[in-house]
């Protein structure tokens, strides 16, 4: 009887370790950090606005969708942002550092995605009065993993509402006027949803079945010993 109980306890402990290990592996695969750059719209040229975006960003997959969490400095200058038509969801603010972290739904974590930015400045910059109010397109270049897929589709935020694009000059920092952009945001097709591997869900089921079988076996043995 003692030997049976030892086997039973060892098996239970092993199952707990296995389930915890695979659960942690699944969670680790669905979140992490990614480096990125902010480009002038539809180019490979780094935007001066890139300096106002802290690196790296964080990504997370939840409910089959991909999200990135981006932190900006000079937060009070940047009055609005969107990526692939999805408006920002502000999740935290740091008034002392003038920073905020916003979450965006995205279609992928690696490659270019289009975004929009609203900038309003009415204060002294480098000791001189400066006023600037503009809305323009930018391009994010994500350098994240390619094996984390989501079922995201681009949002339907008014794609033609931007009054200009950050292509050739950086209005947010130079104050130069920019020509109106008639180009629609070009959004690449989202990746198909690979989903979480099936074995992640099968492991707890198999473990439960094994636990039930062992329990019945132990009870049967115990009953036999009593009789």
UniProtKB/Swiss-Prot annotation:
Please give the GO cellular component terms listed in this UniProt entry.
extracellular region; peptidoglycan-based cell wall
Q: Which SUPFAM superfamilies match?
A: NEAT domain-like (SSF158911)
Write down the superkingdom of origin.
Answer: Bacteria
GO molecular function term, any single one: metal ion binding
Q: Which Gene3D superfamilies does UniProt cross-reference here?
A: 2.60.40.1850
Q: Which UniProt keywords apply?
A: Cell wall, Heme, Iron, Metal-binding, Peptidoglycan-anchor, Secreted, Signal
Asked if Nucleus is a keyword of the record, the answer is no
Pfam families, A to Z: NEAT (PF05031)
Binding, heme = 47-48, 132, 136
Q: What induces it?
A: Repressed by fur in the presence of iron.
- Topology in membrane: Peptidoglycan-anchor
Which residues are the signal sequence here? 1-28
Where is region (Disordered) located? 149-191
**Per the entry's comment, what about the domains?**
The NEAT domain binds Fe(3+) heme iron. Reduction of the high-spin Fe(3+) heme iron to high-spin Fe(2+) results in loss of the heme from the binding site of the protein due to the absence of a proximal histidine.
Under NCBIfam families, the record lists: IsdC, srtB_sig_NPQTN
Q: What does this protein do?
A: Involved in heme (porphyrin) scavenging. Binds hemoglobin and almost exclusively free-base protoporphyrin IX. Probably has a role as the central conduit of the isd heme uptake system, i.e. mediates the transfer of the iron-containing nutrient from IsdABH to the membrane translocation system IsdDEF. Hemin-free IsdC (apo-IsdC) acquires hemin from hemin-containing IsdA (holo-IsdA) probably through the activated holo-IsdA-apo-IsdC complex and due to the higher affinity of apo-IsdC for the cofactor. The reaction is reversible.
Summarize the subunit comment. Monomer. Interacts with IsdA.
Q: Per its record, how is this protein called by name?
A: Iron-regulated surface determinant protein C
> What species is given as this protein's source?
Staphylococcus aureus (strain bovine RF122 / ET3-1)
| Gene field | isdC
């Amino acid at each position: 009887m003692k030997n049976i109980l030892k086997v039973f306890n060892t098996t239970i402990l092993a199952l707990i370790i296995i389930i915890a290990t695979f659960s942690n592996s699944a969670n680790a695969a669905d979140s992490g950090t990614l480096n990125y750059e902010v480009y002038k719209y539809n180019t490979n040229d780094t935007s001066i606005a890139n300096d106002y975006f802290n690196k790296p960003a964080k990504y997370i997959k939840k409910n089959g969708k991909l999200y990135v969490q981006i932190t900006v400095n000079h937060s009070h200058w940047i009055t609005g942002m969107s990526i692939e038509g999805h408006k920002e969801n502000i999740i935290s603010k740091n008034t002392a550092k003038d920073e905020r972290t916003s979450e965006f739904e995205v279609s992928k974590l690696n490659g270019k995605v289009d975004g929009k930015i609203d900038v309003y400045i009415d204060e002294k910059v480098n000791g001189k009065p400066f006023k600037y109010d503009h809305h323009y397109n930018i391009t994010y270049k994500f350098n994240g993993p390619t094996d984390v897929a989501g079922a995201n589709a681009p949002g339907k935020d008014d794609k033609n509402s931007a009054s200009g694009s950050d292509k050739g000059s950086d209005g947010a920092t130079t104050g130069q006027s920019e020509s109106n952009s008639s180009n629609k945001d070009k959004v690449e097709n989202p990746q198909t949803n690979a989903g979480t591997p099936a074995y992640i869900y099968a492991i707890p089921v198999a473990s439960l079945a094994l636990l039930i079988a062992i329990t019945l076996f132990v009870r049967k043995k115990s009953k036999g010993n009593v009789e």
